Amino acid sequence: MSKPIVMERGVKYRDADKMALIPVKNVATEREALLRKPEWMKIKLPADSTRIQGIKAAMRKNGLHSVCEEASCPNLAECFNHGTATFMILGAICTRRCPFCDVAHGRPVAPDTNEPLKLAQTIADMALRYVVITSVDRDDLRDGGAQHFADCITAIREKSPAIKIETLVPDFRGRMDRALEILNATPPDVFNHNLENVPRVYRQVRPGADYNWSLKLLERFKEAHPEIPTKSGLMVGLGETNAEIIEVMRDLRRHGVTMLTLGQYLQPSRHHLPVQRYVSPEEFDEMKAEAMAMGFTHAACGPFVRSSYHADMQAKGLEVK
């Protein structure tokens, strides 16, 4: 029997080390058991990476993180090449250990009190007009990191008054009242929280999270700010069915959510949950049609769609696949 891992503060635990800490064990996928990617999942990288390297350099210079890099997003090259990025605040170590996610798990250090100003200055220097701010889960903080979100929103708006800000927040487990009290005083332009998948597979996909809690978070923010769009995202390929996805979409509408993202799950490493199916572009189109018929004002559905993928276009209601 292997020795238990003793986590050191500030150390990133990834792949096999991270999965070893999850109560519901996941057996590493052997190469021959991997599903072959269909043609529609092939990514063409840009010929010129100058813009990509420039954004990475700006991040490193200011000690900032992007979820694009930390979560190994397949759209990194495209988004960075277009000068867009989703900033990840509160460090790069998550207190949760979801087996679909490539963000590191561990015992995070205290939040950087200078991060809001550094973030605001970086965004101003990049002359961004739309920005997405997300974070790791911080179950070690009494407010789940809500005040840090609010401080970042305030600092960004001071330096870039015309900017639109979307927040992709964690579930603030056990801290919803306090978190919403803080965020209600400094609301974003779009409030996003991802359900990720269907309730039947939550124990395997989102250990430590609760489906109904996440729905309630979205509903309560919408009740306080009916004029602000609420948004949520789902992944397919984790053992769910299309019928179950459509039922989750109905739950989201019942809780006031108006914007939806739906994309294909991709396995970050052999130690993460395996891809159980690849959903075709035609099926994504069918689910988008279902979403629009339910009353979603915007629905971005496609193999490479992620919650913050072309978020500015999503907010404008433009076609995103």
Swiss-Prot record:
EC number, UniProt record: 2.8.1.8
GO cellular component annotations of the record: cytoplasm
Gene: lipA
Organism of this sequence: Citrobacter koseri (strain ATCC BAA-895 / CDC 4225-83 / SGSC4696)
Named cofactor requirement(s): [4Fe-4S] cluster
One GO MF term attached to the UniProt entry: metal ion binding
InterPro entries named in the record: Aldolase_TIM, Elp3/MiaA/NifB-like_rSAM, LIAS_N, Lipoyl_synth, rSAM
Compartment annotation: Cytoplasm
Cofactor detail note: Binds 2 [4Fe-4S] clusters per subunit. One cluster is coordinated with 3 cysteines and an exchangeable S-adenosyl-L-methionine.
Known pathway: Protein modification; protein lipoylation via endogenous pathway; protein N(6)-(lipoyl)lysine from octanoyl-[acyl-carrier-protein]: step 2/2
Protein name in UniProt: Lipoyl synthase
NCBIfam families linked to this entry: lipA, PRK05481.1, PRK12928.1
